[in-house]
Amino acid sequence: MRKALVILALAAICGGALYYFRDNMPWSADASDDNGGAPNPIGDIDQPLPPTVVMSPENRWVDLSKAYKGQVVYIDFFATWCSGCTDEVPSLIRFQQKFGDKGFQVVALAIDDEGEEKVDTFVKRQFDVGGTQTSMNFPVMMGTMEIAQKAGFEGGLPSGLLVNRDGKEVKIVRGVVKEAALEKAIARVVKQ
């Protein structure tokens, strides 16, 4: 009987904590139908993108805080083993197609421990985009967890940062997000 009461009390405490944190995290305040009625994992931030030096596909060091100044950039933190990361690639390809001529650039930052060879194989894959097999149409940079955290990565994949034309991080994306919600956020920043 005592064991059952302890379990019941723990369940009540956990339930209360989940309820509290669900409604008090920064991304829950802007819940939206664009994310299927679920709390929107897109939160507002306002800070400069710090110097973030990564290895480009051409094997050159690139500082993301300078290389894309004047463009809206979505930095996608991913790993090849992350199924949510793989699932969002077609959306990222579509965003690049739709907004690329408006000064928008997707930049993927691989934070795999699997190594460059595994990432190269992943990048060469074809993805189904509206019934058409398409390659990634954006650069994939090699990074580390330390580099990603310096840029603003808070842990958990998939994850991303939306950076405005002035080099300021304006949106942080935590976890899987509905394509429509992310597209809406990108469109707003591109129009600014």
Predicted regions and their residues:
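N-terminal targeting signals for export/organelle localization
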Residues: 1-51, 171-172, 192
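A short beta-strand-turn-helix
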Residues: 51-73, 96-99
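Short pre-active-site segment immediately N-terminal to redox-active cysteine/selenocysteine motifs
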Residues: 71-73, 77-81, 156
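Hydrophobic beta-strand anchors of alpha/beta hydrolase catalytic cores
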Residues: 74-75, 106, 160
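Conserved redox-active cysteine motifs that mediate thiol-disulfide chemistry
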Residues: 77-94
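Thiol-based oxidoreductase modules, predominantly thioredoxin-like and allied folds used
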Residues: 103-118, 133-145
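Short, internal strand/loop/helix patches
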Residues: 123-165
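Thiol-/selenol-based redox modules, centered on thioredoxin-like
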Residues: 156-192
